[in-house]
Amino acid sequence: MAARNWIGLFSRGEGNNLTNALERGYEAALLIQSLELEFYADRKVRPELELSVPRSVQATVLRRFHAALQICRSSLSTVTPNRGQLDPQELRQLQLIETVVSRYSGKRSSSKSGMSTAPELLPRSLLGVFDSVRRQLDPSSEESVVAGFRRRRDSTLASLRILLLLVLVPLLVQQVSNTYIVGPAVERLSPDLSFLSYPKPQLEEVAVEKLRIYKEELEFDALLKGQEPLSSDLLVIKLRERAQELKQEADQESVQAIKNVLADLAGLMAFVVVCLVSRDQLRVLRGFLDEAIYGLSDSAKAFAIILFTDIFVGYHSPEGWTVLLDGIAHHFGLPTQENFILLFIATFPVILATIFKYWIFRYLNRVSPSSVATLKGMNGGG
C-alpha cells in the first residue's frame, strides 16, 4: 500500500511538473508573439534590426525575447516525450510553442537567391501520420493514455473543488458572521456608539414622507367613516407615535447597513485567504476553464461574446447598471446619487467595450481567428 501511494504521489508530481513546464512555455510563446506584434510589425524578431526606440528599450526587448525563447525550447524538450498525456487544449498550447521554436530554429535552408526553400523529401502530413501510427503501436502507449486520462480526471475534480470553495466559503463566512458574530455585536454596541447608528439624510427623507402619508391616511379615514376630524392634540399624539416607529425603522436600517459592510469584508477576506492558500489549484482551474472555453465551437464562442457585450455594454445596459448601482447603494446604506449613476453609465461601459475590443484584437485574433470571423459575421460585419 505504501509503495502504491508513493508511486501515485510521484506520478501526480510528474504531471504537475509537465503542466508547469507547458504553462511556462505557452506564456513565453505568447510573450514572443506580443514582442513581434508590438516592435517588429508582426514579423520575426531580428536582433540586427534597429528599432525606432531608445537603445535601452531595444536591449530590454531582446533580453526578454532570448529568455522567452530559451524557456520555450526547454519546455518543448520536457513536454514532447509525454505528448500522449496531453488533452486537446494542452496540445494546442504545445503546437503554439512548436510554431514559435521552429520559427527561430534556423533549420530552414534557403537557396542562393534567398527566395525559395529546399523541397522536403516527404510531406509533413505524411510524416505526421507515420508518427501517429508509431505512437499507437508503441507498447507503452496504453500506459501513457491511461496516465493522461487520470491526470485529466484529477484536474477536473480539483477544478470543481476549488470552484466550489471560491463560491461557498465566502458566502458561508458572510452569512455566519452576519448572523452570529457581527450582527449581535453591532446591535449590542450601537446604543452606546453613535457612529454605528449615524443618521442618514435619505432615511430621514423617507421617514418624513411616510409620516406625511400617515397623516393624510388618518384624515381620509375620518372622512370615509363620516367622523369628525381628529383634534389637534389627538393628531399630534398619533403622529408622535408614528414618528417614533419610523425612527426605530431608520435606526434598524442604519445598523443593518453596518452589518452588511462588516460581513461583506469578512467574506472578502475569506475569498482572499482561499486564493492565497490554493494557488496551485487556481492554476489547474485556469487550465480547466481554458479547455472548456476553447472546446466550444466558433459559433458558440461568437454567441457567448455577443451575449456578454450586449448585456454589459449594449443598448439596454444602462437600465441594468442603474438597477445594480441602486441595489448596491441600498445594501450599504448609501444615498442614491443620480449624477454619479449617470456619470458611471456614460464612462464605464465605454471603457469596458474598449478593453474587450483590444482583447479581441491582441489575443483572440491570434488564438482563434475563425471565431473572430464568425463574430464579425454574426454581428453584422462590424
UniProtKB/Swiss-Prot annotation:
One of its GO terms (cellular component) is plasma membrane. It is a multi-pass membrane protein. One of its GO terms (molecular function) is proton transmembrane transporter activity. Pfam families: CemA. Keywords: Cell inner membrane, Cell membrane, Hydrogen ion transport, Ion transport, Membrane, Transmembrane, Transmembrane helix, Transport. The chain crosses the membrane at residues 162-182, 257-277, 305-325, 340-360. It is found in: Cell inner membrane. The keyword Transmembrane helix applies. Belongs to the CemA family. HAMAP family: CemA_PxcA. PANTHER family: CHLOROPLAST ENVELOPE MEMBRANE PROTEIN, CHLOROPLAST ENVELOPE MEMBRANE PROTEIN-RELATED. Required for H(+) efflux immediately after light irradiation to form a rapid H(+) concentration gradient across the thylakoid membranes. Together with PxcL, contributes to transient H(+) uptake following dark to light transition. This is Proton extrusion protein PxcA.
